[in-house]
Design a protein with these regions (language model features):
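A conserved helix-loop-strand patch within extracytoplasmic ligand-binding domains
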Residues: 73, 81, 114-164, 226-228
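C-terminal motif of bacterial Sec signal peptides marking the signal peptidase cleavage site
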Residues: 17-21
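Extended ligand-binding regions for polar small-molecule ligands
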Residues: 23, 61-70, 131, 135-136, ...
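A ligand-binding cleft/hinge motif common to bilobed small-molecule-binding domains
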Residues: 87, 100-109, 153-156, 180-216
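Periplasmic-binding protein-like
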Residues: 41-43, 118-125, 197, 201-240, ...
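Extracytoplasmic small-molecule ligand-binding "clamshell" domains
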Residues: 28-100, 170, 245
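Ligand-binding cleft/hinge of the Venus flytrap
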Residues: 49-53, 64-73, 150-171, 200-205, ...
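Bacterial N-terminal signal peptides that target proteins for export
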Residues: 1-12
Length: 256
């Protein structure tokens, strides 16, 4: 069963939503006068986030800037509300969705550039939890980010090893899902392994990650069906080249 938090829980967590939606100006380095590829994403460290110096940083930021450079474009980033992502590309507010976005199960929903890397979907629990396997999640409460693969996995239960949880709590931002786990509102939180790893840097002793992962995701860049397919193909070729020449591996090591 899927539920949304209301009342006091929403008030506790709403600050995250307000901050993410504030639309503060973000500085970008000066670049050549090139055609722009407008990239939509939410803040999802370490893939894309706004640094203290008000610049975009992260794995996907570095990959996007280099891939765009190789095809003669300039990457321009726009923070969006992730559960409204399809509206943004359908209305042309952004050209593509790029932010640790899983292609799996969505192959026919968009034009894709990639995949350019893989990521595991994992489950995070508190250190003192009695949950050690996916099966232990039966009857438990799980927090996820709305419209992500973990949400889909727990709601649809398309694989036989996915447990029947009591409730799936869907949040606009992953930080809210982590907060729900931290405050004891839920028993577990599911997200990308890199995202969980970033969260654990400051709280390693308080949490642990289950050995069993939910799935392995192939990450890509999503465009609407009506977008210029030549640009999509060129970007996909650039990403493949970056995988082959070690550029993507080098970028990933930077954020370990």
């Amino acid at each position: 069963m899927r539920r949304k938090f209301i009342g006091v829980i929403c008030r506790v967590l709403c600050a995250t939503v307000i901050l993410c939606g504030c639309g503060a100006e973000v500085k970008m380095p000066e670049q050549e006068n090139l055609p722009v590829l407008t990239i939509g994403s939410d803040e999802y460290e370490p893939f894309i986030y706004i640094s203290d110096s008000k610049t975009y940083e992260g794995i996907d930021v570095d990959i996007a800037e280099e891939a765009c450079r190789r095809i003669g474009y300039r990457a321009e980033f726009k923070i969006i509300r992730w559960d409204d992502k399809d509206t943004y590309i359908e209305n042309g507010n952004v050209d593509c969705l790029w932010g640790s976005f899983s292609m799996d199960g969505r192959e026919d929903a968009y034009q894709w550039a990639g995949p350019y890397m893989t990521s595991k979907q994992c489950v995070l629990v508190r250190t003192d939890s009695d949950i050690y396997t996916l099966n232990d999640l039966n009857g438990k409460k799980v927090a996820v980010q709305a419209t992500t693969k973990p949400e889909e996995i727990f709601l649809k239960r398309s694989a036989s090893d996915i447990p029947m949880v009591e409730s799936v709590y869907s949040f606009v931002e992953t930080e809210e899902a982590f907060a729900a786990l931290r405050k004891g509102y839920v028993d577990a939180c599911a997200s990308h392994d890199y995202r969980i790893g970033t969260y654990l840097k400051n709280a390693l002793s308080k949490y642990r990650v289950l050995d069993q992962e939910l799935m392995t995701s192939h990450l890509g860049v999503a465009f609407s069906k009506g977008f210029d397919s030549n640009v999509v193909q060129k970007l996909s070729a650039a990403l493949n080249e970056m995988k082959s020449d070690g550029t993507i591996d080098e970028i990933m090591r930077k954020y370990e």
